[in-house]
């Protein structure tokens, strides 16, 4: 009899497990969608902008081993064009221009401490209606809180960025007039663009502060949707 009771107990236990509600499976956490899900990666080309009177090698370096682009500039440097009143810069000017569709800039970014008052990524409105802004968004780093990135000088994107690699994605839906910014794949900002225009991406250092400004970029990608 004890053996029979054991067999019955086992059978009941198995039946109970088989009858367990399937809803229990929903407790298993699901992986959140990545910002690039549904997007298609495209190749891109670019031209380099730098102080007009200097050789590119004096303000730009590419490490083929780590595939890292390093750009720097000093507040005392000359502008892009001789006689211009704009601030000094060393930047990658993307050649891919667009007026519609969805476009995303994606890269790992490293900003050394001491870089203060430099824009390191922007969407430039290269052709825009008279009286409208020249950019849809500019991301600037300041020295506060060990390196703080803001949209222009207001909304905070990320703090504590000095001397470390982190990922930045800027997605622009030109048809809907919407820009979304992701820091380490977390959506941190959604804002409207500034109306119809022909645009392109830029990254590097466009320096409005004092001293030296530097930014490094690797794993740079261009996505469309």
Regions found by a protein language model. Name each.
Residues 61-144:
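Secretory/extracellular carbohydrate-interaction modules
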Residues 1-29:
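Secretory targeting and sorting signals
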Residues 182-186:
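Short strand-turn-strand beta-turns centered on an Asx-Gly dipeptide
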Residues 107, 164-173, 179-181:
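Short tryptophan-centered beta-strand motifs in secreted/extracellular beta-sheet-rich domains
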Residues 39-41, 145-169:
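Short, aromatic/His-centered strand-loop micro-motif at the edge of beta-sheets
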Residues 33-41, 98-106, 116-118, 160, ...:
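Ligand-recognition surfaces built from glycine- and aromatic
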Residues 45-71:
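Extracellular glycan-recognition surfaces and repeat-rich motifs
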Residues 110-112, 171-173, 223:
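Solvent-exposed residues in well-ordered beta-strands and their adjoining turns
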């Amino acid at each position: 009899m004890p053996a029979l009771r054991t067999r019955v107990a086992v059978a009941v236990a198995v039946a109970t497990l088989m009858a367990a509600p399937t809803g229990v499976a929903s407790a298993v956490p699901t992986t959140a969608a990545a910002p690039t899900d549904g997007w298609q990666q495209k190749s891109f080309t670019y031209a380099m902008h730098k102080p007009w009177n200097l050789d590119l090698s004096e303000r730009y370096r590419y490490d083929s081993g780590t595939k890292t682009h390093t750009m720097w500039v000093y507040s005392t440097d000359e502008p892009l064009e001789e006689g211009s009143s704009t601030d000094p810069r060393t930047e990658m000017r993307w050649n891919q221009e667009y007026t519609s569709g969805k476009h995303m800039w994606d890269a790992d970014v490293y900003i050394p401490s001491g870089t203060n008052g430099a824009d390191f990524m922007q969407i430039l409105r290269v052709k825009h209606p008279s009286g409208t802004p020249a950019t849809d968004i500019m991301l600037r780093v300041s020295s506060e809180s060990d390196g703080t990135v803001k949209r222009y000088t207001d909304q905070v994107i990320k703090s504590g960025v000095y001397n470390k690699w982190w990922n930045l994605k800027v997605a622009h839906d030109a048809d809907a007039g919407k820009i979304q910014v992701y820091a380490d794949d977390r959506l941190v900002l959604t804002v409207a663009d500034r109306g119809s225009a022909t645009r392109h991406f830029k990254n590097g250092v466009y320096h409005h502060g004092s001293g030296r400004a530097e930014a490094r970029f690797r794993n740079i990608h261009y996505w469309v949707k």
